[in-house]
Amino acid sequence: MRRLTCARDQFYRVVACACLKESLQQDVSTAIQLRMTNSSDQSAVLLTTLGWSAFFDEQLEPGDAELVPMRIATVHRDRVTAMSELGPVRLKLSAQTNTTDFAVGDWVLVAREDRLLVRRLNRRMQLQRKTEGRRQAQLIAANVDALFIVTSCNEDFNPARLERYLALANEAGAVPVIVLTKIDQTPDPASYFKQAQALQLGLDVVMLNAKAPDAALTLARWCGPGQTVALVGSSGVGKSTLLNMLSEKSCANAQPTGSIRAGDAKGRHTTTSRSLHAIAGGGWVIDTPGVRTLHVSDVSAGLNTLFAEIVVLASHCRFRDCTHVHEPGCAVQAAAADGTL
């Protein structure tokens, strides 16, 4: 009887130890899973802050599990840097990599160990322009939400050039915003505002003095967490000053700003390459060098948006092939004559 009791007690002890061991294993497993989940959630939040979205997430494949998503911050002839969850990283490039295939704002997958750039994800949109002497269009930026078309309230203000930028933004699918700078240096900034607003239906136009304390609030709606804007415009219009204001850079880290010539108000180049910068409000801004001559091509959709009023009126012309110059029954000419266009 005593032997039976001892055997039974020993059996219970073994079962109890086994249950305790299993319980401990479950606790450890739960803790590890919780830790991994929290880490994953934190990673997702950081990627979203960088501009990551479902569009890029859907491009990931099972074999990409060991690769790290990063966002291109600068592109040079022989090197590429990217923004990661831990900050800026210089990427390792293979011998076959052509840096002209990449644009600031691109999302790429990078090997975790050696930081080798493995592949670029498809772009949600891209900004590009034609350059003289080149067959291939030049990439300006990628995966941009809004395009800040910067011009100053002086001799630089050029409606024809602004229209080309608007066509560029419309074609790419970016929200165009005309930013009128240096309003403190003109007696009549309202006249510039009126001219800019008339360029396109529903166009957002803002006026600001980039050095004013509340200047950033004027642009806040386009600069929230995860949003990306690009700055374009001529040299000397205040893009670098605007960049410093948006990123709240200290004097030591600020982008150099240039003066303008007194004779024609044309500026000197202070930005020499495209680059991605964090906005104080949580978004990102892509700075671009000043462009004095902008060529656009293959932007038919962008032009239709730019001249939406004319497109609508043209459908009411008497003749389908109306050139809107001399034909009778031209709705465009009639609208121009009575002041509605």
Question: Which sequence ranges carry the predicted segments?
Answer:
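Conserved lysine of the Walker
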Residues: 239
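Helix-rich effector regions associated with P-loop NTPase G domains
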Residues: 31-41, 63-66, 100-114, 120-146, ...
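Canonical P-loop GTPase G-domain recognition
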Residues: 185-235
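Phosphate-binding glycine-rich loops and their immediate beta-loop-alpha structural context
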Residues: 140, 150-201
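N-terminal accessory targeting/assembly segments
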Residues: 9-12, 16-159
